[in-house]
């Protein structure tokens, strides 16, 4: 649709892996979720294979063919990309109510080629179907509703995977952090494990009294953001904790102040939402 309606040839996924706490906005809209680094567990979301329908069937420099890009009569759309004597058709049928039979006619160097067919839907992703062979430069494909298809003259596609993904485990409890283990904090970008800054920037720093390290809020200027009234804060822990105690040694610097919150169940996104 981006190309058909607006001639857009590139879409940037603004982040690929969700490696932050589930109470933060947009937690599970990425292609992968890896939000428990203490366990090594991760989840591959079906969206990854939607990207594969492009990424494994075309390369940078391939061009869209205007004559092979269109909306489908019963819902969905398709685009065709080509390079040299190869081409790939990527079709989607979101919202379609019935199967659609699509007839393709090729010309020139595209005629007579063997075509691989791959499909993804909510039930199964990136499955190879029976190959097609064009006859007199023509081939027919039946597209099921709410599916993504790639039909291509290329080869070598595969669905990777890893069977030994560690199981998910809860955040370690009880938990204590002195930050003294970071003897070279610059190697970690001055960021400790497991904290997630919501507003401001919290970095590993020397304690004001010189007796070790601490976590220090280092951004002094107010950012121009969607939640201008928010105070700097960072989170750590598990949203499913029920009854617990939390303590912190606080060393205000230059007349500053600090606070400790518990049972944070949402961080807000700036759309009129406050931490609650």
PLM region spans:
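Structural recognition of the beta-strand scaffold that forms the well-ordered cores
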Residues: 9-14, 88-91, 150
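Extracellular/periplasmic catalytic domains that process cell-envelope and extracellular macromolecules
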Residues: 4-6, 42, 81-84, 142-143, ...
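Aromatic/acidic polysaccharide-binding cleft in carbohydrate-active enzymes
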Residues: 1-74
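Carbohydrate-binding surface patches
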Residues: 53-111
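C-terminal beta-sandwich/jelly-roll accessory domains of carbohydrate-active enzymes
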Residues: 90-210, 221-226, 245
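Solvent-exposed loop/turn segments at secondary-structure junctions
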Residues: 1, 16-20, 51, 95-96, ...
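Short hydrophobic/aromatic patches on beta-strands that form ligand-binding or substrate-lining surfaces
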Residues: 51, 179, 246-250
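Secretory/extracellular carbohydrate-interaction modules
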Residues: 201, 207-212, 217-276
